[in-house]
Structure formats: C-alpha cells, structure tokens
Amino acid sequence: MARARRRTRPTVLSDRQAGGGSLPAQTGAKRRTAVLRRLYPLLAFLGGFTWDALTIGQRVRVVDFWRLGAFLVGAALLALWLARREALDRAPPAPAATLRGRLASLAWQAPYLLLQFFFGGIFSALFILYFKSSGHLGTWLTASFLAALLVGNEFAGNRYGRRFTLTWTLFALNAILLCNFALPHALGSLQPLWFYASTVAGATLTHILRWLAPGRPGRIGPSWALAVVLMLAFRLDMIAPVPLVKRQLAAGQDFVQASGRYSLQVERAAWWQWWRDQAEIVHVPEGGRLYGLSAVFAPIGVTADLEHRWEVRDPDGWRLVYRRPFTTTGGRDRGFRGYSWVLNPPPGDWRFIVATQDGRTIDILRLQVVRGTPAANEVLVREID
C-alpha cells in the first residue's frame, strides 16, 4: 500500500523576518517621504528667494537684467521643446527600477523642472524688485499677486508641459514684467508710454513664440487678456513705478542741510510699532514748519520727474495743500534726495506723498498733526546722506 504523501505547508515570514521592518514602520517611512516631497518645493522656493534677496541687493543693476533675460530665453527654448515633443506624440517612459529606467524618467522630467526653475528665478527676482518699489495698498496687492504666483510655480511641476495655455500665460507675464523694468532702464525715461509699449512687446513676444511652436498647442488669448489687465492696473496706480525704489521717507521739524547731509527731527514710534520709522503723531507749534524728506533710487542713466504732495483730510476727502515738483538723476546708491515743507499746518490727518509727476505713487507717509512740542525723550534725529 502506497504511503500517503504528507502535504507541506508553505512557510510564511513575518514582516520583520522578511527584512522589510514592521508594517507601521514602513507606513511611517512612506508618510515621511511624502511629507518631504510636499515640502521640497517650499524649501526650494525659500532658498531661491533668499539667494535673490541677497544677490539683487538694494539697487537694480544691469547684470540683473542680463540674468533674467537669459532665464526668459531658456524658458522660451524649453517651451518650444515641449511643444515639439507634444506634436510628435511621444509617451513618457515606463516606470522601471533599473538605473537605465531611472535615467530615462529623469530625462523626461528634466524640461519640466528646468522650465519651473526659469519661471521661478524670474518670478523671485521680479517680486523682490516690485516689492522694493511698492509704497501703498494698490502696489502691495500687485506684489502679493506676484508672491502667490511665485509659490504656485513651485507646485506646478509638469503641468507646464500638459497645459500649454498656462505655459504661454506665465511666459507672457514674465516677459511683460521684465520688459516693464528693462525698457525704461534702457531708454532712461519713465514716461507712461514705455509701460504700454513694453506690455505690448511682452505679449507680442509670447504670441510669436506660440506661432513658432510645433502644432501651436494651447491658446494665446489669456496672454493678451493678461496684458489688458496689467494696463488697466497701471491706470489705477496699482503697478509700482519701476525701476524707482524708495529709500527713505520722513516728516518732522528742525531740518538741517550741511556737508552733503540732510537731517530732520522726528518723533519716536511706540515700541510695538516696529514697522514704523517714526510716530504717526507729529507735534507742530503754532506758526511752525512741517518738513518732509525723501530719498528715491533710480538706476544710472534714468531721469525721473518726481513731486512731493502734502494733503490734508477735509470732510469731503483729501485736499491738496502744497505740491513741489523736482527732477531726479539716477545712479546715486542712497537715492536722490528731495525736501519740502508746509507752514503752520492745521491739526488733523495729513499725507506726505512722493510720486512721479504723471501721478504714480512711490510712497505715502500718513501723519496726525497736533499742536504743541514733543517731549525731549520722544525725539530723535534722522539723517539722510
């Protein structure tokens, strides 16, 4: 009689015996990896932003325009490459664990990453430049919009290659904002005409780029719509008067001009008003003068027609009390200085404004004038050299 064969049971190894670690440990590692992947764009953004803030510094240099122009050319070439790949209907490589498969996957993703890098580099630098040129709510909103795009770019990834309308629109925004800076700088003039011309030039450049792209993917209409929105924002004084950058703004008494230095007595801001250079309240004695000082940087070769405006709030709104026009010549690192004053200003709410003579606001200092003399321990001297 044949011996019955014994059925063997397969050996089942636990997760720890199989060398894979416990299931909770594997899950935790995957979660940490996922979190790091999500944080990587933010860390890259902070690193790039810090680098631009340090390298661009406190003034606009010609080398900055050349660098940003190179980024824009790189973005244009990558957009054409992605359009060609789209027209050839090439599929991404299949996932593989081998070195060759990983290199193929990296090569496929490289254009997306480089385009993201170029857009991020331009957005970061332009945000810093527009941030430095912003001086009131409207321009702060525009700078905040650029900041939102800067952060959003870090999470866009390969959407640029799959949604060409987005690619053309962001390219148009980069080209327009860069031309808004570069054209006035090259011509040495801040006439409003150059803003409109540079805006149309940036949109036209994008239109030509799409026309050259194989298959002409995506739509160009949103790029032109963006140009119209920017020109409307310019009319509403929501675009900072680039490339002008406000250095200092102060209002007070006992103005002294000596040995190439301007000094002014101002009142200290409260300890918790860390963002203010001086107190909002200004004490002015009967018959006294209230002085205003400004320092505005303009690049070498740029001439700007500026003005000081003193306005007081009436029951019907803000009323112009005094306006002093003057012309700046660019190139001074600490900014071109100007001063003005009002005699015996009545108590109430005041605004000291430095702006271009065509109406674009550079900065606003809000004040509350009261009669009297400030306490000695609340006074300090500010110098603008």
Task: Please identify what each model-predicted range represents.
Residues 320-331:
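Solvent-exposed serine/threonine-rich low-complexity stretches and specific carbohydrate-binding patches
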Residues 214-228:
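Membrane-interfacial entry segments at the cytosolic side of transmembrane helices
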Residues 231-305:
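Membrane-interface segments at or immediately adjacent to transmembrane helices
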Residues 347-358:
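Short, aromatic- and glycine-rich surface loops/edge beta-strands on solvent-exposed regions
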Residues 356-365, 372:
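Short acidic/polar inter-strand loop motif in beta-rich domains
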Residues 1-155:
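Membrane-anchoring hydrophobic segments
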Residues 162-212:
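Membrane-embedded alpha-helical segments of integral membrane proteins
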Residues 290, 329-339:
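Aromatic sugar-binding surface patches on proteins
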